[in-house]
Amino acid sequence: MGPNCGVDDPNAVIKGIELANTLGMDAISIGVVVGFAMECYEKGLITKEQTGGLELNFGNGSAMNALIKKIALREDIGDVLAEGCKIAAEKIGGGSEKFANHIKGLEMTGYEIRGLKTAALGYAVSRRGGDHQRHGSYSHDLKGTVDRYKAEPGRGALVMNDEDLYCILDSFIICKFTRGVWQGPYEELAEVYSLVTGIPMTADQMKKTGERISNLARLLNIREGLTRADDTLPYRAMHEPIPAGVSKGSYVTQAELDLMLDAYYEARGWDNQGVPGLAKLEELGLLDYASIVEGGAA
């Protein structure tokens, strides 16, 4: 809520988070939506009359929190914004789609992906959209284990491995802040699983389970009509370079994204449209879902 809305008053930001929690809304999404509304207001796409008298300028903490309430109660422009920035942009129009910061309809979390190429791929292929909890691939960029400004084929395998591990951590209901303490990590996770359930489990079996979950999620998205075209990034991330700072000039080109998508699909054993083939489904015990991908990869 702070940077997205230009609000530097910590009390206003804390109040906004409290409101979101109390009113049953995600604080990340609501911060992006309010920031989107502020940009619409400053560009003349939303009027003061539509806001119910609120002056939605960037930096206006009181207006930010008042709008959060309106969104929860679907009052004035809040009725449109309550649908999220993707649908709101479709309704507001006027080019607002270009600054609606979402992936697959889910508002982006707080990472500047224009200067984090591994993270950019992780977000693009995320089954939920703009959710850092599906991959955590920004860690490679931030730790300097890769050149964060460079798109390379090897990023595909990195993101795949992160996703599969996160599937296991979610299945264990383990906080991902502990992801670095598990030895192996699958060796220790498999040992814990066996000790708790009494069911023998090897590290390889545990790893394969994570892969199975990732592939099943992909199948469900394909069933719902998602394609390679949905594995993309917000317009701003791909067309507007970072204006200042150490990452000045960075953004993700379509060619860079395509290179990393191809590498990711290849690492997954999918075809170039991101569709798992029958051989992969058989390997993972998912042939019951073969009808979803008929005509896809072999």
Q: Where is each model-derived feature located?
A:
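Extended C-terminal regions of large enzymes
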Residues: 1-298
